């Protein structure tokens, strides 16, 4: 991930290294900073796939109930399971990773933590959230806080999206940097900007007006 190499390395270390007891890791930050993308990159990495025996990804909506969350976990980790005990039984003896994406409205993951055995084998729960209090409540020592990208990282991300072989024509660089500054380091905004510019094509970028683009970010 452009601009998130250090965070990715730290996240993989938290997932794979350290205390073998069951731990809850939180990726914390404002909306649009790339929490879900970072979690997904780690979740789908070769290291994580090889390390964990069982993985599951659960999206937590603002309307999720405890029962719905358990049902989503059941469908992800074991077919035909009907009780919280079934999840526990299925995961016992396995090294597992369960991701709770967008756990920002209520601390439901904490309410269902009893569904997961702690076999002291390196299993992990991973939350993405905008709520700092939730990360503290889950496990104060293991939050990974995301901040906005700096201008160099933002520009690199945009160039990778828009230009072939990551080669921006010199005459377009100043305009491109002025546009990317309007994204304030938020990867989601840069992604939208890159999508808009890619559709226009690099030959048309020179006639793009900053005001027109910024109004759509």
What are these regions (language model features)?
Residues 17-19, 48, 105, 187, ...:
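Surface-exposed loops and adjacent edge beta-strands of modular extracellular domains
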Residues 41-51, 85-149:
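A conserved switch/coupling segment of P-loop NTPase cores
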Residues 55-64:
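A short hydrophobic beta-strand->loop->alpha-helix junction that borders the nucleotide-binding pocket
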Residues 1-33, 37-46, 50, 61, ...:
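N-terminal flanking helix/linker immediately upstream of nucleotide/cofactor-binding cores
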Residues 23-24, 37, 50-52, 67-70, ...:
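Intrinsically disordered, low-complexity regions enriched in proline, serine, glycine
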Residues 73-81, 85, 121-123, 131-217:
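Non-catalytic, charged helical/coil tracts that couple and regulate nucleotide-powered enzyme cores
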Residues 26, 30, 62-63, 130-132, ...:
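Short, acidic/turn-prone active-site loops that include or flank metal/cofactor-
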């Amino acid at each position: 991930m452009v601009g998130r190499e250090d965070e990715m390395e730290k996240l993989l270390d938290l997932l794979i290294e350290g205390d073998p007891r069951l731990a809850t890791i939180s990726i914390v930050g404002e909306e649009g900073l790339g929490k879900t993308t970072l979690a997904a990159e780690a979740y789908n990495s070769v290291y994580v796939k090889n390390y964990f025996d069982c993985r599951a990804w659960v999206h937590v909506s603002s309307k999720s109930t405890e029962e719905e969350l358990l049902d989503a976990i059941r469908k992800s980790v074991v077919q035909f399971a009907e009780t919280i005990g079934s999840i526990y039984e299925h995961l016992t003896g396995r090294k597992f990773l369960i991701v709770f994406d967008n756990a920002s409205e209520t601390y439901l993951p904490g309410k269902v933590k009893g569904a997961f055995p702690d076999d002291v084998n390196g299993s992990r729960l991973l939350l993405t959230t905008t709520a700092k209090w939730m990360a503290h409540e889950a496990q104060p020592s293991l939050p990974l806080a995301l901040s906005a990208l700096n201008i160099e990282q933002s520009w690199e991300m945009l160039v990778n999206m828009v230009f072939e072989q990551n080669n921006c024509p010199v005459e377009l660089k100043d305009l491109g940097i002025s546009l990317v500054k309007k994204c304030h380091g938020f990867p989601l905004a840069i992604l939208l900007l890159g999508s808009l510019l890619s559709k226009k094509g690099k030959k048309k970028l020179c006639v793009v007006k900053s005001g027109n683009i910024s109004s759509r970010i």
